[in-house]
Amino acid sequence: SGSCSLKTCWMQLSPFREVGNRLKQKYDQAAAVRLARRRRLEPVNQRFSPPTKMDLVYLETSPDYCMRNDTTGAAGTAGRQCERGSAGTGGCELMCCGRGYDSFRATSTERCHCKF
């Protein structure tokens, strides 16, 4: 009698946090390019090497989200509340775009409808 063995291979995605970190790294290193002859991409800054298939590139710069833009409907960031200690997108350093910010302390009293 014969015997047979079965092998199964599968591919699996990396953990979500790792994928996000890699994508953020690519975003931070993205290079501006323009369309050259024969539909080839070349870097806008000639000091850089031509992009590879693994590089993230862009043709147009992003709008300035700090400033109000009625054409695109962007409200800008002036007047918004920020988180003073945060290093993230909601943090004052990033959200206030170098304009500075006012700090204030607020106390709120609300009924909690607690039952004991």
UniProtKB/Swiss-Prot annotation:
Disulfide-linked positions: 82-97
GO molecular function ontology, one term from the record: frizzled binding
Glycosylated position list: 69
Gene3D superfamilies named in the record: 3.30.2460.20
Lipid moiety-binding residues (O-palmitoleoyl serine): 1
Keyword Oxidoreductase: no
Cellular location(s): Secreted, Extracellular space, Extracellular matrix
Biological process, per Gene Ontology: canonical Wnt signaling pathway; cell fate commitment; neuron differentiation
Keywords noted in UniProt: Developmental protein, Disulfide bond, Extracellular matrix, Glycoprotein, Lipoprotein, Secreted, Wnt signaling pathway
Any one annotated GO CC term: extracellular space
PTM note: Palmitoleoylation is required for efficient binding to frizzled receptors. Depalmitoleoylation leads to Wnt signaling pathway inhibition.
InterPro entries: Wnt, Wnt_C
UniProt key word Glycoprotein: yes
Chief place where the protein resides: secreted
Family stated for the protein in its record: Belongs to the Wnt family.
Function according to Swiss-Prot or TrEMBL: Ligand for members of the frizzled family of seven transmembrane receptors. Probable developmental protein. May be a signaling molecule which affects the development of discrete regions of tissues. Is likely to signal over only few cell diameters.
Protein name in the entry: Protein Wnt-5(I)
